[in-house]
């Protein structure tokens, strides 16, 4: 248990959206809250979570726990991406391309939060279609998970890094 606490302290956590939702029943409406969060270590690990509860703090706590449980690693290249990528989830489409040092994170809303916690410092990004935060986060993570480093490509092709970079 102590290891989880220690691990949790060095993660960046961002709350993207809190939404009030309702369920209509015979006696009226039952309100609850949903929370969308992302966590990352700033060094290529990221996860997102979506929690739902009757109170806002409980929904945030649930989503943070889910985000910590669903983390995975992304190949980064000195604070940017190795190559341009596209991601898609339902109606949301995102495009991200590497940028020179000093550019910063040029992205909007939910996409910016994901890129900040994963550790990307320089990127040009654009979201197309639906800007629903949940779908944008999923599309961004889908795009980031498709990033391949030159070492990964070389290993898959059975070549050296120098031969594929020519």
From Swiss-Prot:
The S5 DRBM domain, residue ranges: 11-74
Pfam families (alphabetical): Ribosomal_S5, Ribosomal_S5_C
BP GO annotations: translation
GO cellular component, one term: small ribosomal subunit
Source species, domain of life: Bacteria
Coiled-coil regions listed: none
SUPFAM superfamilies linked: dsRNA-binding domain-like, Ribosomal protein S5 domain 2-like
Family annotation (PROSITE patterns): RIBOSOMAL_S5, S5_DSRBD
Keywords from the named record: Ribonucleoprotein, Ribosomal protein, RNA-binding, rRNA-binding
Entry domain remark: The N-terminal domain interacts with the head of the 30S subunit; the C-terminal domain interacts with the body and contacts protein S4. The interaction surface between S4 and S5 is involved in control of translational fidelity.
Described function: With S4 and S12 plays an important role in translational accuracy.
NCBIfam families per UniProt: rpsE_bact
Quaternary structure (record): Part of the 30S ribosomal subunit. Contacts proteins S4 and S8.
Record-given protein name: Small ribosomal subunit protein uS5
Species in which this protein is naturally found: Aliivibrio fischeri (strain ATCC 700601 / ES114)
Organism ancestry: Bacteria, Pseudomonadati, Pseudomonadota, Gammaproteobacteria, Vibrionales
